[in-house]
Amino acid sequence: MGGMTVLKLYNTLTREKTDFRPIDPKNVRMYVCGPTVYDFAHIGNARPIIVFDVLFRLLRHVYGTDHVTYARNITDVDDKINARALRDYPGLPLNEAIRHVTERTETRFLEDAALLGCLDPTVQPRATENIPGMIEIIETLIAKGHAYEAEGEVLFDTRSMAEYGQLSKRNLDEQQAGARVAVEAHKRNPGDFVLWKLSAGHEPGWESPWGRGRPGWHIECSAMSGRYLGEVFDIHGGGIDLIFPHHENEIAQSRCAHGTAVMANVWMHNGFLQVEGRKMSKSEGNFITIYDLLHTEKFGGRKWPGEVLRLAMLMTHYREPIDFSIKRLEEAEHLLSKWPVHGSASGEADPAVVAALTDDLNTVAAIQALHALAQKATADARHLGAFAASAALLGVEPKEIELDEAVVQEIDGRVRERLELLKSKNYAEADGIRADLLARGIQLKDGKDPETGERVTTWEVKRSQV
């Protein structure tokens, strides 16, 4: 179906939604900025993880599972990591402390992503494994007049690129310096940003033509995307907060180093996330990690399944701001509870679900179509294959519900009690037991034993309110 389905994607670069035409349909390439591994991922970080996982699934559906390359980096060199290492492991040499921080944080991130139902990206490069590529790009930028050395740093000269500010639509004269760069006298322009900086003796560093040092924030992604996807690739994604300065500076570095008209053809950004109507922050007391949500009772007094968090995120279009709340999680859980548990996703995905997703990842419409299909599948098992394949596109797949043994025994007892009531023709009380169990998500099925002809009753969990 690859030649038949056309995706429409909103491109931040052009501020338009247009047909997506990959450079090479046999190798569609997407890069998404991954975590800086100094702290555990919070629910705001979960949004791009989930959104671009859905896009990855959709691209694989349209172009084939072997024809999509998805790169999501791990930033494991950063001053925030250094600070966290000094705080958490004061008795260790800094490099060893840094390794402890990055390894534990990366491991937790990958566990979180898996519990949110995300596929592994094709490649997950670490910044520390790509330092030579960064140095090479910086050397090229200096040689081409786009970068300069000053007081132990190598800086990008923003005035050297006529189209700087194109992504964020900022005029260079109006711009403030980048988020991680202080305005200092040694800069030619206030907006010039660091490509390389010298490291003190105790700090992590790599040998370079400019002395032992470490890379700036932005050069890392230019090097890793270029290495794994090429000088120009199809899609670059991330949160809306990365448009400036990070993505703007990535574009400047890559285009000026490679002499290309674009870095990526399509730039996609997911919207901001608030918690219960307020900006999420530690000072507000509403800072929630993915781990906290899934494994503790810090939010709403209970643990939440990963598929509930995932569906709650997808119930808002990815470009819209999202207000994350207990109510939203409850709504997502209620919706999931009405969907059939299924096995293999061997059917054909529902055209209405595919059509919604190919319209700039309209997950809201896709969920509505999936819910309609769920109702059909509940009534007629022939629709289960289509439901399973469609749910797999969203990565939201209802799980089998495991009940405590005590609950199972209690339900079995109620079923036996009902059978006795039916034998004595006490239908009203028997119907009352059926209704009580159904209200808890337990559906009874009456039949006959083929050998004895006696009435038998089986039950199954249809909803998650048990």
Swiss-Prot record:
Compartments, record wording: Cytoplasm
Residue sites binding Zn(2+) per the record: 33, 221, 246, 250
One of the record's GO cellular component terms: cytosol
Binding positions (ATP): 282
Matching InterPro entries: Cys-tRNA-ligase, Cys-tRNA/MSH_ligase, Rossmann-like_a/b/a_fold, tRNA-synt_1_cat_dom, tRNAsynth_Ia_anticodon-bd
Keyword annotations: Aminoacyl-tRNA synthetase, ATP-binding, Cytoplasm, Ligase, Metal-binding, Nucleotide-binding, Protein biosynthesis, Zinc
Coiled coil: none
Catalytic reaction list: tRNA(Cys) + L-cysteine + ATP = L-cysteinyl-tRNA(Cys) + AMP + diphosphate
HAMAP family reported in the protein's UniProt record: Cys_tRNA_synth
Subunit composition and interactions: Monomer.
Official protein name in the record: Cysteine--tRNA ligase
